[in-house]
Curated annotation (Swiss-Prot):
Belongs to the eIF-3 subunit I family. This is Eukaryotic translation initiation factor 3 subunit I. PANTHER family: EUKARYOTIC TRANSLATION INITIATION FACTOR 3 SUBUNIT I. It is found in: Cytoplasm. The keyword Electron transport does not apply. Component of the eukaryotic translation initiation factor 3 (eIF-3) complex, which is involved in protein synthesis of a specialized repertoire of mRNAs and, together with other initiation factors, stimulates binding of mRNA and methionyl-tRNAi to the 40S ribosome. The eIF-3 complex specifically targets and initiates translation of a subset of mRNAs involved in cell proliferation. Component of the eukaryotic translation initiation factor 3 (eIF-3) complex. It comes from the Eukaryota. It comes from Cryptococcus neoformans var. neoformans serotype D (strain JEC21 / ATCC MYA-565). One of its GO terms (molecular function) is RNA binding.
Length: 341
């Protein structure tokens, strides 16, 4: 499984996402730009921002999200701004300004709403906002959210939309997982006794019935989206920064590693800078893919399950296209059903 290595960032990666077709990958970095890449050959298609005095971000870009039509791109940064871009032209269509950094953005499944999370800082609370999008005239957007959730407890770090867009699921600094009503902004459910440290990533399953969380407590957990019950736990020896659920195959991929400041040697093994594959049902590790020279900060899986990508502290993105053997593998033999190829 030889990777395609994407070299286009000068600093560490914060978030990478495939588009719905899987032919493009978008990467957000601490170097203030977002890049778009062809996943088939690693060619850079374009850059959003990065021009001095232009309308890009001024500082780290923490988060990126692309709509299901690959028409619009949302980004959020350390400059307290959220930006709407046209994918095709690279043009910034609109900018929202906040009082603190934008740590996460996400589209709902109908592409008619999106959420943003702003940081708790300088006396400002962590705020989750739900906006509607004007797709007809994208340069004319409302600065007023439909719903605003000002959090009094632990700050939110990540969030996803539940199917039908009635609820959002949030992960928090304390390890709490919560469900919020999109219309009322009320917290309708919360679990505070599963993860014991910051939630670094949250990603939905392909069918929308469950989701996975990654945490600094060195575990990833699989949750039922209706009940918020933990179904499976995947345990490692280092903080988990990102976790994905592979479509069609029974695997979970985890990325993380010892924080850069705590690594005393450049050995990949010492820092555990590998993508780690776990069996979804049996919770056992079944394989590793090495290559990065720093902790993996972000993972994304191809929507059809044909590849996955990792972005790391070393500034590189690696796209791994799975070989035929991956789709036929049965690490637990007769305990598993025959793969559908």
């Amino acid at each position: 499984m030889k990777p395609i290595i994407l070299q286009g960032h000068e600093r560490s990666l914060n978030q990478i996402v495939f588009n719905s077709e899987g032919d493009l990958l978008f990467s957000a970095s601490k170097d203030s730009v977002v890049n778009a890449w062809y996943t088939s050959n690693g060619e850079r298609l374009g850059t959003y921002g990065g021009i001095k005095g232009g309308d890009g971000h001024n500082g780290s870009v923490w988060t990126v999200a692309v709509d299901s039509q690959t028409r619009f791109l949302l980004t959020g940064g350390a400059d307290n701004a959220m930006k709407l871009w046209e994918v095709k032209t690279g043009e910034c269509l609109y900018t929202w300004e906040f009082l603190t950094a934008v740590k996460r953005v996400a589209w709902n499944e109908d592409d008619d709403m999106f959420l943003s999370i702003t940081e708790q800082r300088s006396g400002q609370p962590s705020v989750i906002r739900i906006f509607s999008i004007n797709r007809e005239d994208p340069r004319s957007q409302s600065t007023t959210p439909i719903t605003e959730m000002r959090l009094s407890g632990s700050r939110a770090t990540v969030a996803i939309w539940a199917p039908l867009s009635d609820y959002i699921i949030t992960g928090h600094e304390s390890g709490k997982i919560a469900k919020y009503d999109v219309k009322t902004g009320e917290e309708v459910q919360a679990v505070e006794d599963e993860h014991s440290a910051l939630i670094s990533d949250i990603q939905l399953s392909p069918d929308g019935t469950y989701f996975i969380t990654a945490s600094k407590d060195k575990t990833a957990r699989l949750w039922d989206i209706e009940t918020l019950e933990v179904m499976k736990v995947y345990t490692t020896e280092t903080p988990v920064n990102s976790a994905v659920i592979t479509p069609d195959r029974p695997y979970i991929i985890l990325g993380g590693g010892q924080d850069a400041m705590n690594v005393t040697t450049t050995s990949q093994r010492a820092g555990k800078f590998e993508s780690r594959f776990f069996h979804k049902l049996f919770e056992e590790e079944v394989g590793r893919v090495k290559g990065h020279f720093g902790p993996i900060n972000t993972l994304s899986v191809h929507p059809q399950g044909r590849a996955y990508a990792s972005g790391a502290e070393d500034g590189f993105v690696r796209v791994h296209w799975f070989e035929e053997s991956y789709f036929r593998s049965r690490p637990f033999g007769d305990l598993e059903p025959e793969p559908e190829v």
